[in-house]
Amino acid sequence: YHPAREFAIDLVLFINGLPVATVELKTDFTQSCEAAMDQYRNNRLPYDAKTKRREPLLTFKRGAVVHFAMSDSEIMMATKLDGENTFFLPFNKGRKDESGTVHAGNPPGEIKADGTQEYPVAYFWEEVCQPNAWLRIFHSFVYVEKKDVVDIQGNWSKKETLIFPRFHQWTAVNQMLADARENGAGMTYLCDHSAGSGKTSTISWTAHDLVKLREDNGDAVFNSVIIVTDRNVLDGQLQDAVKQIDHQFGVIAAIDRQKSSKSKSKQLSDALLSGTPIVVVTIQTFPYAMEAIITDKALKGKNFAVIIDEAHNSQTGSTAAKLQAALGMSGQGKMSTMTVDELLEQLQKSRARPDNISYFAFTGTPKHSTLMLFGRPTDPSQPISDDNPPQAFHLYTMRQAIEEKFILDVLNGYVPYKTAFNLSKQLEDSKRVSGKAAKRALAQWMSLHPTNVT
């Protein structure tokens, strides 16, 4: 990429002659993935260190979209090269241990027919780099996220981040889409994605792809996608992410009483009847949507996808009582304190839950009721039971998020009161202690709790 200085990158991937990705390769026998990241930070600068001339291939928003640091066993990626400030994200599948807990990294490579073992990172060229998959990533996933940020002096500015999907985001969206294409409306999907998983982007990609999903005859699988957010005031971050993926006018309608003179029910009715592709509502407005879908004759025969973000945490409010009355459901009066999970469970029991709606639930802390409502049986051919419990459709564990350094392991700072009291009491009772006893007490303090996060 710089003939005069004989700089060369191991691998560059092109689409129609345009460079879209670079790869620095290392082998674990001599160097690790960390060495490839250091090479990007120190030697793959977006400008020539001597002449200060820009390197087009490595310049943000000008050259390659993503830069991969790859060893035999791990893959990391960055979308902006910025010297020592270059930030890498993992692009790994996750590795299960014997207990079933998913950790950071990749599983061992498969044994091939000739007896040799495949590389743990073989999924990169066997799955990700396949022509259709590779093209779809750049067509449907890559986008520029724009945020207003303020510095320490109080000055506001626009921050741009080029978003490339992490591996679990890419697989989650693809698997849900493939299942929805095969089975149509009326299905449930539970994405058990921990904090640090990038749920906002995953929800946005899912919504846009569901809108574009088509039957073999060209008809839309879902006429509208309803996104339910866990906030009284519509989640600006989620709305912005959804809008930034597709800039077409009229694709998204946000049902917000503060931004329209129309009532929420009227806004919803207009959006659903006009076939607005993506409709964003709050938990409190969600019962209006369910009432319209179930009772409005003009919406009969239409299919809907409902994406629920952390729905089990918030209450639906008094609007749910109107839905309850409209459907003739029992237990009137309790509806205002229900969560969305409980509301849908009530619909299911009343047999009013329509089969023209698919539910896509995203949560990092699924309750038992959430699993029962949105989970799939371990053995799909058998009903849910104690021997065949429900499970999430897709999983990104807290343990993996901790090991990938997206969230902190709070148990590292966990001190049981009893242990702390006993140690403090011993110190009070004996003012002078031997060095050996003190070291033993400190050792106990350092290994307080064996609990693991899964």
Give the location of each predicted region:
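Inter-Walker segment of RecA-like/P-loop motor cores
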Residues: 243-291
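Phosphate/diphosphate-binding loops
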Residues: 45, 49-70, 255-256, 305-307, ...
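Conserved RecA-like ASCE ATPase "motif II neighborhood" in helicase/translocase motors
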Residues: 269, 276-308, 314-325, 332-349
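Intrinsically disordered, low-complexity acidic Ser/Thr-rich regulatory segments
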Residues: 114-122, 156-160, 338-357
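Structural recognition of the conserved hydrophobic beta-strand(s) that form the central parallel beta-sheet
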Residues: 68-69, 279-282, 357-363
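Interdomain helical connector at the RecA1-RecA2 junction of SF1/SF2 helicase-like NTPases
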Residues: 369-454
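ATP-dependent helicase/translocase motor core
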Residues: 1-225, 229, 233, 237-249, ...
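Loop/turn-to-beta-strand initiation segments
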Residues: 224, 275-278, 302-305, 355-360
